[in-house]
Amino acid sequence: TCDLYRELLKDVRGITLHENPSGRFDSNYWLNTIVLDPLLRVKGQENAYQATVQGAVGGAGGVTHAAVNAHTDCEPNANVEAMRVGLDAMGIESRPLWKPMHKQPVYKDCPAYVNGVSESLFKVGLCLPSGPYVTDEDVAYIVDCIKKNICYN
């Protein structure tokens, strides 16, 4: 699946597929993730969180408060949330990268040793459908839908 995602996404500006950092590593790619450049414009990003909050508070990555205060200090960028919402509308389930543990309410008072990497990845990352039942045709459809959600002007 990763090889096909890599091939189909290689020329999509603003999207980077996570891969092995060097030949010393050999990922099993049980989860394929992409990073969206913060400058990448995605259809609907101006209202991405508004639409999600209206649907279900807590449904958006990082939303943990009532709708009057729907944003937190650690949430995916609007273009990531807009891509997730856009893919969902096309029948594709995706999700933000995991929210850093030290930013989750249950761990807010626990000691944490952080350097900012987990927060920065959470803001720009999106998990794509992966696994043995994701066919080549599925991957092609997913990438096509990603492209359709990008504003190219």
Q: How should each PLM-predicted stretch be described?
A:
Residues 1-153:
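PLP-dependent aminotransferase class I/II
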